[in-house]
Amino acid sequence: MAEARRVLITGASSGIGRHAARRMEQEGHRLTLICRNHQRAAETLDWIDPTTRVLEADLADLEQVDTLCATLLQEQEPIDALVLNAGLQYAGHRQPRWSRQGIELTLAVNHLAHQLMLMRLLPLLLQADEPRVVITASEVHNPTSGGGRVGSPAGLGDLAGLRSGAGSAMVDGKERFDADKAYKDSKLCNLLMGLELARNQPRLPVIAWSPGLVIPRSQDGFFRESRRANPLGQTLFGVVARDLLRLTESIENAGDLLTRLVLQLNAQPGFQYWSNSLTRPGQHRFEPTAPSAEACDPETATELWRLSDHLIATALADQC
């Protein structure tokens, strides 16, 4: 077996992340899994391995994320791979939800919590001999992709909502909340965050990836909030997309792809984006892909990072 790698994973309590974590644990790697509460931590340990290290932090609370990072920094254990996989969406809900710091929940969890972790834990990554960052994004960040064409397209505009601080429902500053677009925008933020990180740390491999459409049969995981808003519609959507049209990828295959990116891919310094694209019903091809034009804009990436950093700092200062 190859030398055990030290891997920190968010979003390992269900779905793709949980499957990948189990694979990596079975291969003898040293995992630290971030779970949002004690119940999720216990369930994750039961499914993966009772000896796996789990730390609790709710990504909807930047103060908890900051405390988590402080704990890891105090330990001074290098991180070989930082896997930013956690994500949520609540399409179907008409009103925005808010984090503890008053930030729209999709942005807070999918983007800001992960940028905070990147900023705080970067010293531990740079202590490792062969570090890498892996970010789970989505093809829906791209308005020309299959999923990106459904509903309002991703687009950050001039970042007016982010610029105005906590309390804005949409990153682009639009007053009307659109939960589906908020998710797409958060995935666009993930790619831009990775692009800016790679620019600032040119020797660090930064890999963003899209797993394809994954719709499990279970009632928990990624689509749980959307099922609560529209249980019948989401059930029918799953049956049609997964079972009839065969447009989806399985949790197992997607988890294996994530494991490959973390452990097996010969990652080169700089930013790269991989997509698990549907080629025909039941068939996917996993390969390097060009992100959307907006996801490649260096000026937007730099400004997004700056404004996100400012919002994080302001939110944490207000907790004091």
Predicted regions and their residues:
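A short, exposed helix-loop element centered on a Lys and neighboring polar residues
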Residues: 118-119, 195
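NAD(P)H-dependent oxidoreductase Rossmann-fold/reductase module
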Residues: 1-80, 87-89, 148, 171-320
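Ankyrin-repeat alpha-helix packing hotspot
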Residues: 111-112
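Active-site beta-alpha turn of Rossmann-fold NAD(P)-dependent dehydrogenases/reductases
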Residues: 86, 134-137, 169
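Short alpha-helical oligomerization interface
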Residues: 92-108
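A short helix-coil junction within the Rossmann-fold of NAD(P)-dependent oxidoreductases
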Residues: 75-76, 93-94, 120-129
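Helix N-cap/beta-alpha junction loops of NAD(P)-dependent oxidoreductase domains
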Residues: 89-94, 142
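Active-site loop of short-chain dehydrogenase/reductase
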Residues: 78, 125-162, 203-205
